[in-house]
Amino acid sequence: MCMSFSGRCILSDYMVGRDANRGDCAQPCRWKYHLMEETRPGQYFPINQEENGTYIFNSKDLCMIEHIPELVAAGVDSFKIEGRAKSAYYTAVVTHAYRQAMDAYFAHPSPDFRVPDWVLAEMEKMSHRVYTTGFNFGPLQNGQELNTGGYVRNWDVCALYRDQQGNRLIVDQRNRFFEGDVLEVLEPGQKPYTLTVRDLVREADGTRTEAANKATEVYSFAVDRPVSPDAILRRKRDED
């Protein structure tokens, strides 16, 4: 096993007793480290980028969605999406994006195939690290993220579909959203679309509200179209 790359980490079992091979990796590759050579106690290897240490064990995330033709030409006929310790939202977004990319390729197979822009955009809408193609095209170039151990998180899941009654969409809140917010709706097999939050109501007491800011409470708002029972509603984070 690799000593310290995400999802395959023997350090997890050794350090905290959580076995990566059993889907329980603690992801020590994402922790902050200082290195010290054993014959020089107290003398740290001079590679710290910041006060918290360095991230030399920190791999970027593998992403091959733009290379479907090459994978098919290589004989790949089944794709496994890494999903251990990932959220249901992450799994939904990534599998949906790859499914759409593969369907688009097989509808018009060509070495010059390009993934639709909206599908590529999906890969930026869940928590991830900077992407790399790994070792698929030769020796790894710039495959580690040396400057930070953090994730790219530009979108929040705001709500999950609960019910629809006429023109009222009823949702289970997951992160706060507000009257007037533009939410993007992710449905299975469909290109995402947007809804504007109008006439927001807290279902517990039927009162109008400007903010859905009570965790896991049920809210409703007006919509002008049917929404899939499997829909996930998300909102782009405000830029600082």
Describe the role of every protein-language-model region.
Residues 1-78, 85-159, 166-240:
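Active-site pocket-lining/capping segments in soluble small-molecule metabolic enzymes
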